[in-house]
Every structure is written in C-alpha cells, then in structure tokens.
Amino acid sequence: MSKRVVIFGASGGIGSATYEVFKNAGYLVTPIAGRQINFVYMASHSDVDDILEQVEPDIIINCVGHFDKTNKETHCNTFDVNVGSNWSIIRHYINKQVSDKPIKIIMVGSSAYKSGRKDYILYAASKAALYNVWQGACEYFKDSNITLGLINPVRTRTKMIDIKTSAICLEPEDVAQEILSMASTQSNQLVDMNYPEGN
C-alpha cells in the first residue's frame, strides 16, 4: 500500500517541488496550500487537527515559511509561521499520546539557524527556535513510533526571497529530493544542505 503524505505549504517553491517528487515516487499526496489554511494562524488552527485526522498520513511535511527583512512588523508573522506552524503539527501527536503506526514529521528550516544576520534577525532566530523544537520533540517521542526530520538548506531559489539569476543557490528540486530521502528512514534526522561541490 502506498504511504499517505500531507504537505503543508504545497504551493510554494520547495512545497510544490516536494509535491511533484512524492507524487512521481508513487505516494498518495494531499497538498495543503495557503488558500486552505491561513498559515499565520496555523499554530492555533483546528483545521490542522482536522486534516491530520481525516488523512491519517504516514508522513507529514511542513514547507510553510515566512521570510522578511528586519522591521517592527515582522515579529508575529515570522514566529507564528516558522515556529508555530510546526508546533501545531507536533502538538497534534502529543495530544494523541500514541500512534499505532510509524509516523514521520519533516520540517524545513534554514542554514540561518546557525547564526544571526543583521537584515534577518527574527528570521534567523525563528529557525534557531525551530531547531530547538526539533530537538525537544525528538526527545519527547523517543519511545514512540513517531520520528522527526529537520532539513536546513542554504539559500534556495524560490519566490520568497529576491535572488539574482546568477546567484549561487540550491534549486527547490534539490531540497525536495533530500526530503524524499529523509522520508524513507524511520529515525530522527538533521540534515544541513550545502551548495553543490564546485560552487
């Protein structure tokens, strides 16, 4: 039987590439885009529970992200989306307490989690917080059938950020292939993606 996959943020650059990769690999994929859920309020959105209850996925992939330069308006959206959306998924399984089948939760972070950046202070901070969420959740679920993956790519060519055509960066398909590889392993994983060799 094909495994069932839910992809949050499936209309974005990495999300849409991930949808195509999993669909072509034979998974039963349920894509969730921003028009179905307001990702800013996803941290307290009952629709997340409803989707996970209805689909009963084997793999949950969260590609939702918010990227903005540092200004006084960025705080709530940046943390609500980059941290809160992932927490809402983890919280769903904490509330269930037990799973009778293996479940893999995969979150998309950023290489920015390693160091602050002056123009993206809160973005980098939110990705560092996501790393800690991943660590804590791995510890929480260590005696269960639930495992978690966190993938931290370097700069990736998506519409979310303004990148010059000539800039060195990953392609969304590169990240999607790494997510596919991560989904095949039932263990906790942290992957820091770098630029291809030679760049």
Predicted regions and their residues:
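N-terminal Rossmann NAD(P)H-binding glycine-rich loop of SDR-like oxidoreductase domains
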Residues: 8-20
